[in-house]
Amino acid sequence: LNSWQKVQYRLLWWSCRAVGLLPERVLYFCLGGLIRLILYRLVRYRRQVVRTNLAHSFPEKSEAERREIERKFYHHLSEVFVDTILLASISRKRICERMVYSNVEEVEAAMSGRSWISAMSHFGSWELTINYVCHTDHNVLAVYRPLHNRVFDRFYHEARSRFGTQPVAMNDTLREVIRGHRPGERPVIV
C-alpha cells in the first residue's frame, strides 16, 4: 500500500472497530437497515443481475414471489456487511459463541493426521466461519479472491486472520498447501 492507502486502511479499520463496539442489535437493525437501503434502493447494487438470476433459477415463481426473495437477499447481504464490520472488533470468545459447528469431534477424528478441504457456499454468515480455528489444531487456510481495491483487500485479509486463520489468495493455494504440508502441520482449507 502507498502512504495514502495506508491512511485509508487505518481509517477504515479503526472506524469498523469503533462501530463494532455498538450493541449487536443496534448494528444489525440500524446499520444493517441503512446498508440495505443504500444497496437496494439508492445504489441498486447488482439489482438487474439478481433479478435475472432469480428469473432463471425460479421460473415457476411469480414476479411478486421473486421480488420477495430479492428483498430477502438484500437483507441477508446487509447482515454479511455488518458481520464484516464486526470482524474488526469481535472477541474470540464471542465469535466462537456466534458460530456453532455440529459433529466437530467426529470430523476431527475422521480427518486425524490428514489434510482436508471443507467446501462451503456463500450462504449464511460466511465471514464468521473463520472461527473454525476455535475447534481445531489444524492450520486453517481460507481461500479467497483478492479484491481490486487494495485498501479493502488488506482490511479483509487482516480481519480474516485475526484468530489464526490464514487467508490465501486463490492463485497461491497450491503453493501454500504444499508449504503447510509438513509432518504435524496438516492444512484445512475452507
PLM-predicted stretches and their roles:
Residues A88-V190:
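Soluble catalytic domains of membrane acyltransferases
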